């Protein structure tokens, strides 16, 4: 079976102090069972997730799954917006938190264990969440 280019999983292997790279084979298997086939891309440096997300959306991806921590999720979210407009208004974001904090996941009441969160993606419902922009200058 070919890779589903409509779903792109963007992975930060350094999340969770490098733990994500170690557990990735298990995460990949769980995601295959819960969401079906997908294309996965691993980031290699800071800022990668934003550019990889934007590129995937511009190439027709309709679902991006972020696998990493809160910082990685922030980068992926930034890839959805360009010039204060959505890159693809029909695209959806899912996430599987494997970082050390996972504050965003906790705030939405999503299970802390990645295994449970991956299982929940089977019946995930799309919810619209407002996006804000904060700029800090000194």
Regions found by a protein language model. Give the residues of each.
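ATP/NTP phosphate-donor binding region
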Residues: 1-67, 74, 78, 115-119
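Catalytic core of DAGKc-family lipid kinases
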Residues: 34, 43, 81-138
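Gly/Ser-rich catalytic serine loop of serine hydrolases
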Residues: 69-70, 99
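Short, active-site-adjacent cap segments at secondary-structure transitions
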Residues: 72-74, 103
């Amino acid at each position: 079976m070919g890779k589903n280019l409509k779903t792109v999983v963007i992975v930060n292997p350094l999340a969770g102090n490098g733990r994500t790279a170690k557990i990735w084979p298990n995460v990949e298997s769980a995601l295959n069972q819960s969401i079906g086939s997908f294309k996965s891309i691993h980031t290699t440096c800071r800022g990668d997730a934003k550019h990889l997300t934007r590129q995937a959306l511009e190439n027709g991806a309709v679902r991006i799954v972020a696998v990493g921590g809160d910082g990685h999720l922030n980068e992926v979210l930034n890839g959805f917006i360009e010039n204060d407009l959505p890159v693809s208004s029909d695209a959806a974001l899912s996430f599987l938190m494997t970082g050390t904090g996972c504050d965003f996941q906790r705030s939405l009441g999503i299970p802390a264990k990645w295994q449970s969160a991956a299982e929940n993606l089977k019946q995930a419902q799309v919810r619209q969440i407002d996006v804000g922009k904060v700029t800090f200058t000194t």
